[in-house]
Regions:
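RNA-binding accessory domains that recognize and position tRNA/RNA substrates
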Residues: 1-180, 194-214, 218-221, 225-236, ...
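Nucleotide-activated chemistry modules centered on ATP-dependent adenylation/adenylyltransferase
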Residues: 2, 26, 131-140, 144-181, ...
Length: 394
């Protein structure tokens, strides 16, 4: 399997080396968790994985789950000679090419061969056309082919591929500081958590139990979405922190109607700040997006931020709901996120879309941040086992 990097390939030597070490460790833990064989050789520009023929597609799909990876391809490793490349392309054409247009996409890593990338495209295309099955009329389309035969020629080996699995990109997991992820079990928060994981930050998942204001399936759906997130980083000791927030939420509801959601979100990030201090996290991540709810207007987000000294990261800030929902479907967290939870009872009769920090401070319970500290200290730790997405199979 040939594994390609993105941002990782442009890092300085020292930083790149540390990140590649993280990527290799993450990849090996994924292979072990999924019971897949593979020898992982992490190189400066590419990672090569040697595996069994029957496991090659599953290993390539696993490689495409590794943060920092742009794409992965089941590949045939051969000698970097014209004859070997022609033979490999001919074999691939005879076995798989069943009609439509094709192209040979060739590239070389160094100028140490007696041919250019253009030469490979030319003689490789001839080999594909000559070996095509009898019922096929080969046709070249370099712009939008039905079939792409990829050839990557490196100094010591050449690699021929027909299939490419797109990866998440980003940075290797664990190369950034951890963040506290506030997970409600809704559509947005697991997607936001995944996005910071994709950029290298481990997460500390925190769920606030709303007591009488939560529904019977509220916690269950939050746990299931976190299990799906854990699938992408199974080498970690995953915990789900359940914060008993029912009494505090009830007191906030009694104290305010208009502005209630703002006061609650300020309490929420204060809880997250306390937990971040305990876990060495450098910030908080939420699934908020500008204007999606009354508490998420630009002005109201600034009022929420004023309740904590930590940065509040919002990866979905400018995303539309349809885009977020599609991302949740790709992660296989959408169905769990849409289980009825019955927590809309907390919503006020009149929404506050343009709040005032002074007014919220005046109306919110004066002990709300003390409650946040106590509730965070009482958080229950629940071990999490990773769960595979519905479309996964070895």
């Amino acid at each position: 399997v040939l594994v390609r990097y993105g941002d990782l390939s442009i890092k300085s030597d020292d930083v790149g080396r540390r990140m590649r070490d993280k990527l290799g460790g993450h990849f090996r833990s994924l292979l072990e968790h999924r019971n897949l064989p593979g020898e992982v050789d992490v190189g400066h520009a590419r990672t090569i994985v040697e595996t069994d023929p029957e496991s090659v597609e599953a290993v390539a799909r696993t490689a495409a789950d590794v943060f920092g990876v742009v794409s992965a391809s089941p590949t045939l490793a051969i000698e970097p000679t014209q004859e070997s490349i022609e033979d490999a392309l001919a074999d691939a054409s005879a076995a798989y090419y069943d009609g439509g247009t094709f192209a040979v996409d060739a590239r070389r890593s160094r100028d140490v061969h007696p041919f250019t990338s253009e030469d490979v495209g030319r003689f490789g295309g001839d080999a594909v056309a000559a070996a095509a099955p009898a019922h096929v009329e080969p046709s070249v389309d370099l712009d939008d082919p039905d079939w792409t035969f990829e050839v990557e020629v490196r100094p010591d080996r050449a690699y021929v591929s027909l299939e490419r699995f797109e990866g998440p990109g980003g940075l290797p997991y664990g190369t950034q500081a951890p963040l506290v992820a506030l997970v409600s079990g809704g559509i947005d928060s697991p997607v936001a958590a995944y996005e910071v994981m994709r950029r290298g930050s481990p997460i500390v998942p925190v769920y606030l139990d709303l007591g009488d204001y939560g529904g019977p399936d509220h916690e269950a759906r939050a746990v299931e979405t976190v299990r799906k997130l854990a699938w992408h980083a199974p080498g970690e000791d995953w915990e789900f922190l359940r914060v008993p927030a029912g009494d505090s939420v009830a007191a906030i509801a009694d104290a305010l109607d208009r502005g209630r959601m703002l006061a609650f979100r300020r309490y929420m990030v204060s809880v997250a700040e306390e937990i971040a201090s305990e876990h060495g996290a450098a910030g908080i991540v939420t699934g908020e997006a500008i204007g999606q709810k009354s508490s998420q207007t630009v002005r109201n987000l600034s009022i929420t931020d004023a309740a904590t000294e930590l940065p509040v990261h919002r990866p979905l800030l400018t995303r539309d709901k349809d885009t977020i929902s599609n991302m949740a479907r790709e992660l296989d967290t959408f169905s769990e996120s849409t289980i009825p939870a019955g927590c809309n009872r907390f919503a006020p009769a009149s929404a506050e879309t343009g709040g005032s920090l002074d007014r919220i401070r005046e109306k919110e319970p004066e002990d709300v941040f003390r409650w946040a500290e106590a509730d965070a200290a009482a958080a229950e730790r629940i071990a999490i086992e990773p769960a595979a997405p519905a479309d996964w199979s070895n």
